Amino acid sequence: MAFMVKTMVGGQLKNLTGSLGGGEDKGDGDKSAAEAQGMSREEYEEYQKQLVEEKMERDAQFTQRKAERATLRSHFRDKYRLPKNETDESQIQMAGGDVELPRELAKMIEEDTEEEEERASVLGQLASLPGLDLGSLKDKAHSTLGDLKQSAEKCHIM
């Protein structure tokens, strides 16, 4: 009970008195960081090693994501003929140079490319004209072809 009162009120009381008490809590300063966390020295070292490894993995994943984004930006710069950015190139090189885009991003780029190819075609240009009914044009073309085939068959029989 005394421990709980000391932990709850002790810090506030020290702040109030301005730590005039001198060295009454110096015994806690002698503990190592491992003992303060309730671990043995070996456990603490293993814990620190795991923390370092996890940090390295997170940094590697972060670098990979940055490189993927840089690859996407450079793709769009090439696509729209914008000037290249050296920071993007350096991010790609930091990740190992060969960066694959995630499936979703690659799918988006592929869809954009297909749409642009469709717009670049003659039918895509015709479809973009206002007041032009592409469906009726196709129907007329098919009926004309059908009429031509029938007239060609009649001539061939004679």
Curated annotation (Swiss-Prot):
Chief location bin: other
Subcellular localization: Synapse; Cell membrane
Coiled coil location: 39-74
GO molecular function, one term: syntaxin binding
Disordered as annotated region, ranges: 13-47, 74-99
Domain of life: Eukaryota
Keyword Coiled coil listed: yes
Lipid-modified sites (S-farnesyl cysteine): 155
Functional description taken from the UniProt entry: Complexin that regulates SNARE protein complex-mediated synaptic vesicle fusion. Required for the maintenance of synaptic ultrastructure in the adult retina. Positively regulates synaptic transmission through synaptic vesicle availability and exocytosis of neurotransmitters at photoreceptor ribbon synapses in the retina. Suppresses tonic photoreceptor activity and baseline 'noise' by suppression of Ca(2+) vesicle tonic release and the facilitation of evoked synchronous and asynchronous Ca(2+) vesicle release.
Record protein name field: Complexin-3
Record organism: Bos taurus
